[in-house]
Amino acid sequence: MNNKIMKEGLTYDDVLVVPAYSEVLPYMVSTSTKFTKNIILNIPIVSAAMDTVTESIMAIAIAQEGGIGVLHKNMSIERQALEVRKVKRSESGMILDPITLTLSATVGDAFALMRENKIGGIPIVDEDVKLLGIVTNRDLRFEKDMNLSISEVMTSGQLITTELNDLENAESILKENKIEKLPIVNSDNQLVGLITFKDIIKNRMRPNACKDQYGRLRVAAAVGVTDDVLKRVEALSNASVDAIIIDTAHGHTKGVVEVLKKVKSTFPNLDIVVGNIATSAAAQALIDAGA
């Protein structure tokens, strides 16, 4: 029986790493690694796809530091897609799908939408998504009538830009015109994006954040081997998820491989990660299937 009982145990406080001579300075060290073929992490940390660990708050915090969070799948398709959108909208170089209101909205609608999404400004558009104005916290600060039309308080005629190269000079444009939000429109005056001074500050404060090509925080989401997997992946893809994790206890099975092939053939440009596995044979089988 004695050979089955560990007689000595060590914990972190019991072990010290003895420093040795080094010519490597901290600024010379890179902790970056690849999460997928297309996603580089600045720190090798991924949060678990567990309902007690990762929803949008954790995913935002992890991505801000350079890692990536995997949203758990124990929720409805609609809610999981919403969690993805919360991460993607939390900060960005340019918000590609800004939340908007139309002229039929009220001050109460604007207050509710700002509070729900934790935002400070909402572009006002018509039925063709043409920009009519913008309403911000400053416009609503002293408003008491929740039934007042949004057209009565919105700011119209604010500076907008259609020049993509203006993005590089967004901070100077905002400062020069003493505004905090810069709507971006196309040649037909349709809203295509929104740049905020707050996001520019966030970019400066967190230079190692894990972001996509549009400056948005990256996020992954878990799916299972279920009948509605394609429907879930479609919703997540439409929400701009960066990677799909096929999350299962044993990933080296026929069912998992078939789901992987089905997802990859339907969404060929989406990065797919599969787990859990424990052997090189399993890894090769999943790579061959598209992971």
Where are these regions (language model features)?
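Active-site-adjacent beta->alpha loops and helix N-cap segments on the catalytic face
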Residues: 27, 76-85, 143-147, 166, ...
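Glycine-enriched alpha-helix->loop->beta-strand junction motifs that scaffold or abut catalytic
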Residues: 63-68, 238-244, 266-270, 287-291
